[in-house]
């Protein structure tokens, strides 16, 4: 064991690295598990730790949380896999069908986003299915077996019944693992707004919040995350019944872009019909000024989601950054994933920020 330990650290070149690594190894119990590795596996791992700081950081952070709770969500939070990994957030995938073939909503790995939206533009049919109770049970149990509690945040109940599947799995597993805790939170959000919510929860967890404290905070503040959307292509809003066929046809001819938001029940509500893309871009940023914490002095993060309309998303981001000089970093632009995108279609831009409590 001592020889293996020395091999593991032969690439570390200074005392600070060694001290930090030893503390993390002891805290994660990895030190006592070296017998499960052979020499070549340890050498391979150390090579990665030495050459790739990001991999080293990700692995050590994961090991540091070995005995803590799992922070989890669904793929419909529409962040990248790199983002989920860097924030130590686990996720489970929704499903969708494209022209009758089933895929996982796996963050664009099976079908890249550009190909997905091009297929929709060319007339492909898409439909989605939520995570079922059996899938949740298997997913949750993989953590419970390791002695970890779980805080799972679901896609809004206003647009999906996935929380019901999660609750069924929770009740089943609590009987099997009475010593463990599973908390389920309805985000009342979607897409990267849901993702921005998860990012804040990860911040609080990393700042020392307990499982119970994080659950309480999530329940108290989920309606402070604002979701505003517009679309320049009404096709899928007509298909989804959010806009009537007659109104959609006339709106398309007149260049009308509907402006919607998510209300206090997590449902999408049409708020305004705005003619021309230029005006709706200005209008959505006006909504941020109206509802964001401290108005133009807003100093939180801002995310944007877009479905095959990066130019429109970039125009919104540029206007936000010009109007809100105290933002916490640049506006982050993410792709609307394949599950959410099956309903929005191409041409949707969504703006997310923290603000006053959402109303009906």
Language-model segments: what does each one mean?
Residues 1-37:
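Hydrophobic alpha-helical signal peptides and transmembrane signal-/tail-anchor segments
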Residues 8, 28, 32-34, 49-50, ...:
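Intrinsically disordered, low-complexity cationic segments
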Residues 12-15, 37-45, 50-51, 59:
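Short terminal hydrophobic/aromatic SLiMs and anchors at protein ends
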Residues 65-68, 76-84, 89-95, 162, ...:
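Mixed-charge interfacial surface used for oligomerization/domain docking
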Residues 70-135:
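N-terminal glycine-rich anion-binding loop in soluble enzyme alpha/beta folds
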Residues 73, 154, 306:
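Short beta-strand/turn micro-motifs composed of small residues
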Residues 121-157, 164, 168, 215:
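Glycine-rich phosphate- or other oxyanion-binding loops that anchor nucleotides, phosphorylated ligands
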Residues 154, 183-184:
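A glycine-rich beta-strand to alpha-helix segment
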């Amino acid at each position: 064991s001592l020889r293996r330990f020395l091999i593991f650290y032969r690439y570390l070149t200074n005392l600070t690295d060694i001290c930090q690594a030893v503390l993390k190894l002891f805290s994660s119990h990895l030190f006592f598990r070296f017998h499960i590795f052979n020499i070549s596996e340890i050498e391979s791992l150390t090579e990665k730790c030495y050459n790739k700081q990001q991999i080293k950081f990700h692995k050590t952070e994961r090991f540091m949380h070995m005995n803590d709770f799992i922070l989890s969500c669904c793929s419909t939070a529409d962040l990248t896999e790199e983002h989920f990994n860097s924030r130590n957030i686990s996720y489970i995938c929704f499903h969708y069908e494209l022209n009758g073939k089933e895929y996982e909503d796996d963050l664009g790995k099976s079908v890249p986003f550009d190909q997905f939206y091009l297929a929709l533009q060319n007339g492909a049919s898409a439909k989605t299915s939520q995570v079922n109770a059996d899938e949740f049970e298997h997913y949750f149990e993989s953590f419970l077996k390791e002695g970890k509690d779980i805080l799972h945040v679901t896609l809004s109940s206003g647009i999906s019944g996935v929380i019901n599947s999660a609750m069924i799995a929770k009740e089943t597993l609590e009987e099997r693992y009475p010593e463990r805790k599973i908390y389920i939170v309805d985000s009342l959000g979607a897409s990267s707004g849901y993702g921005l919510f998860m990012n804040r929860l990860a911040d609080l967890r990393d700042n020392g919040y307990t499982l119970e404290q994080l659950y309480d905070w999530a329940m108290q503040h989920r309606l402070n995350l604002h979701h505003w959307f517009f679309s320049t292509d009404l096709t899928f809003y007509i298909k989804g019944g959010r806009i009537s066929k007659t109104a959609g046809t006339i709106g398309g001819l007149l260049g009308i872009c509907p402006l919607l938001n998510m209300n206090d029940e997590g449902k999408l509500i049409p708020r305004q019909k705005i003619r021309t893309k230029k005006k709706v871009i200005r209008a959505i940023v006006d909504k941020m000024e109206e509802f964001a914490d401290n108005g133009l002095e807003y100093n939180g993060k801002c995310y944007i989601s877009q479905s095959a309309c990066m130019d429109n998303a970039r125009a919104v981001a540029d206007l936000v950054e010009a109007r809100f000089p105290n933002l916490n970093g640049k506006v982050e632009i993410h792709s609307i994933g394949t599950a959410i995108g099956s309903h929005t279609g191409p041409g949707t831009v969504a703006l997310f920020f923290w603000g006053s409590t959402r109303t009906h």
